[in-house]
A protein has these predicted regions:
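Polytopic transmembrane helical bundles with strong interfacial aromatic enrichment
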Residues: 1-199
Length: 199
């Protein structure tokens, strides 16, 4: 039940981000409006919270040893400590996608401020760039690496965490790398938005 709920929440978040990009698209050729920016920002906050909630449910499936979820079966076992739940998530392509999308969503909201992005057009373009990128990544993840794919006949035991992922600090290293990538992407979007007034 929880897995299906998280999957539908993920789909809803994807639709919300796509709608946000659609609402903000006029800022590419116009000066933008306060209403569109408010809607876009609130939509981004709402979608980020939905993504975080969905990811939290995915983590709970690792802790609960729910081997009906394909990624849990492939990278976890009942003998693996719950401490390695996040590490096991990183060991799968689905988890890598999800964590990067979640980090990009959070970092982009942290970098959004009216002091740097002084005009509605700049704010609108920044939010549009981020929402369009997130929408494309989410569609790609859901279509090629769905983290909530189910196994029709679930096994009693998972395959376990690959030995290479048991090394200490590997998770922290990947988290730091993803944070840097997300910060770089959001900063690039912000810079382009700030210096594209005449476009």
């Amino acid at each position: 039940m929880w897995t299906e709920t998280a999957h539908y929440i993920l789909l809803f978040a994807t639709a919300a981000i796509g709608l946000e990009a659609l609402i903000l698209s006029p800022t590419l050729w116009s000066k933008g409006s306060a209403v569109a920016i408010r809607l876009g920002y609130r939509g981004a906050c709402f979608a980020a919270s939905l993504l975080a909630f969905s990811f939290g449910i995915l983590m709970s499936r690792y802790v609960a040893n729910d081997f009906s979820v394909a990624v849990v079966f492939e990278n976890f076992s009942s003998e693996t400590s719950p401490y390695y739940a996040l590490t096991a998530c990183f060991a799968s392509r689905e988890g890598v996608f999800f964590v990067y999308i979640l980090m990009l969503s959070a970092v982009s909201l942290l970098l959004f401020n009216a002091k740097d992005l002084s005009t509605y057009q700049e704010r609108g373009r920044y939010l549009f760039f981020i929402s369009a990128l997130l929408f494309m990544l989410l569609v790609l993840m859901i279509s090629t690496a769905n983290p909530f794919a189910r196994i029709s006949d679930p096994p009693l035991e998972g395959l376990g965490l690959p030995p290479a992922w048991l090394r200490p600090y590997k998770t922290l290293k990947i988290l730091a790398s993803f944070s840097a990538y997300a910060l770089l992407t959001a900063t690039f979007a912000k810079t382009v938005s700030m210096y594209s007034k005449g476009w």
